[in-house]
UniProtKB/Swiss-Prot annotation:
Domain of life of the organism encoding this protein: Bacteria
Organism the protein comes from: Gluconacetobacter diazotrophicus (strain ATCC 49037 / DSM 5601 / CCUG 37298 / CIP 103539 / LMG 7603 / PAl5)
Protein name: N(2)-fixation sustaining protein CowN
GO BP terms in the entry: nitrogen fixation
Record function comment: Is required to sustain N(2)-dependent growth in the presence of low levels of carbon monoxide (CO). Probably acts by protecting the N(2) fixation ability of the nitrogenase complex, which is inactivated in the presence of CO.
Membership in a protein family: Belongs to the CowN family.
């Protein structure tokens, strides 16, 4: 029997760190090849968040609507799907 995941009780068995790292890895080509000023801003905010002791899950959460809109515009279904999965399980 598969153990049920209840994000409101615990992140146990959710593997949020791995999932978050996967989303950032999928975002990397957008960081590297984009002319959009958003990506530079996003990465600067990530550095600030890390300096404040916040993790990448929080960074994604802070920019969730914008990220989803951009990924839709870029037709990046794979990254959008992983981001939405992370949203459902962990945010």
């Amino acid at each position: 029997m598969t153990e049920q995941i209840d994000r409101y009780v615990s992140f146990r068995n959710v593997e949020w760190e791995r999932r978050t790292a996967e989303v950032f890895a999928l975002l990397q080509p957008h960081f590297d090849g984009s002319t959009s000023p958003f990506w530079d801003y996003f990465l600067r905010q990530r550095v600030i968040a890390h300096a404040q002791g916040l993790d990448d899950l929080r960074v994604l959460h802070n920019f969730l609507p914008t990220l989803k809109d951009l990924l839709e515009e870029l037709d990046d279904e794979r990254t959008l799907s992983r981001l939405e999965e992370l949203e459902v399980l962990c945010m």
